[in-house]
């Protein structure tokens, strides 16, 4: 038997991945078991989708691949029904096993250009960046979008280092021809400033996953972001 027949990929369950949303006003929700507490992540994600979340990212650094796949299998029907992409953090193997819509990697994960070769040209590839140089490398590697942070400091990533503030985000948004999201400690009080700095949306964990009412929290973020986008457009 030829070796290539042993490693031939399984046929895809979904031939056309759901694309990354176009335009501005993106609310990008990242799962977190600690922020969820005793509540089921499936219930929280369902509520966020009802509230209008544009992207769901499956993130869990501390569980085996098998458990992450199981959670992804529970989330996929929810995101598919909503027409919203499901992106897997870091774990390319889990993303491929699920036939998820994309992968998000950080600076210490598998290099973005390698991930792009593995997942192919159609799936979403997100990259965490903190500098213009990192953002340019991500763009050259075939990234679909970049998330810039940690902006304000976040308990969800205690090893993230000191917050970088909004100026690096503004510089990246001016320089790189990719959608730019802000991430790191974003909430209703500061989301507008992220949009005014040039981001097309915000990536959040606690602001939605940890909220008493995730649906209402997602809707409230929408309202704040929409207002900030209007303000930015009027300012020229």
From Swiss-Prot:
GO terms for cellular component: cytoplasm. 4-amino-2-methyl-5-(diphosphooxymethyl)pyrimidine binds at residues 57-61, 89, 128, 157. Belongs to the thiamine-phosphate synthase family. Condenses 4-methyl-5-(beta-hydroxyethyl)thiazole monophosphate (THZ-P) and 2-methyl-4-amino-5-hydroxymethyl pyrimidine pyrophosphate (HMP-PP) to form thiamine monophosphate (TMP). Its cofactor is Mg(2+). GO terms for biological process: thiamine biosynthetic process; thiamine diphosphate biosynthetic process. It catalyses: 2-[(2R,5Z)-2-carboxy-4-methylthiazol-5(2H)-ylidene]ethyl phosphate + 4-amino-2-methyl-5-(diphosphooxymethyl)pyrimidine + 2 H(+) = thiamine phosphate + CO2 + diphosphate; 2-(2-carboxy-4-methylthiazol-5-yl)ethyl phosphate + 4-amino-2-methyl-5-(diphosphooxymethyl)pyrimidine + 2 H(+) = thiamine phosphate + CO2 + diphosphate; 4-methyl-5-(2-phosphooxyethyl)-thiazole + 4-amino-2-methyl-5-(diphosphooxymethyl)pyrimidine + H(+) = thiamine phosphate + diphosphate. Binds 1 Mg(2+) ion per subunit. The gene is thiE. This is Thiamine-phosphate synthase. Its EC number is 2.5.1.3. It comes from Roseiflexus sp. (strain RS-1). Keywords: Magnesium, Metal-binding, Thiamine biosynthesis, Transferase. SUPFAM superfamilies: Thiamin phosphate synthase. 2-[(2R,5Z)-2-carboxy-4-methylthiazol-5(2H)-ylidene]ethyl phosphate binds at residues 154-156, 185, 205-206.
């Amino acid at each position: 038997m030829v070796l290539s027949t042993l490693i031939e990929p399984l046929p895809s369950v979904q031939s056309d991945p759901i694309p990354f949303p176009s335009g501005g006003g993106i609310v990008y929700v990242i799962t977190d078991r600690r922020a969820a507490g005793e509540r089921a992540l499936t219930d929280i994600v369902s509520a966020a989708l009802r509230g209008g979340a544009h992207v769901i990212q499956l993130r869990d650094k501390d569980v085996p691949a098998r458990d992450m796949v199981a959670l992804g299998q529970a989330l996929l029907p929810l995101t598919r029904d909503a027409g919203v992409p499901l992106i897997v953090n870091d774990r390319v193997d889990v993303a491929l096993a699920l036939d998820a819509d994309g992968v998000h990697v950080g600076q210490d994960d598998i290099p973005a250009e390698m991930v792009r070769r593995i997942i192919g040209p159609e799936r979403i590839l997100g990259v965490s960046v903190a500098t213009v140089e990192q953002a340019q490398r991500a763009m050259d590697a075939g990234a679909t979008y970049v998330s810039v942070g940690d902006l304000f400091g976040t308990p969800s990533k205690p090893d993230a280092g000191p917050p970088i503030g909004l100026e690096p985000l503004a510089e990246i948004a001016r320089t790189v021809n990719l959608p730019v999201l802000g991430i790191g400690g974003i909430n209703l009080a500061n989301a507008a400033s992220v949009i005014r700095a040039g981001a097309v949306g915000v990536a959040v964990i606690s602001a939605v996953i940890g909220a008493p009412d995730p649906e209402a929290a997602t809707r409230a973020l929408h309202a704040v972001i929409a207002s900030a986008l209007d303000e930015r457009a009027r300012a020229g």
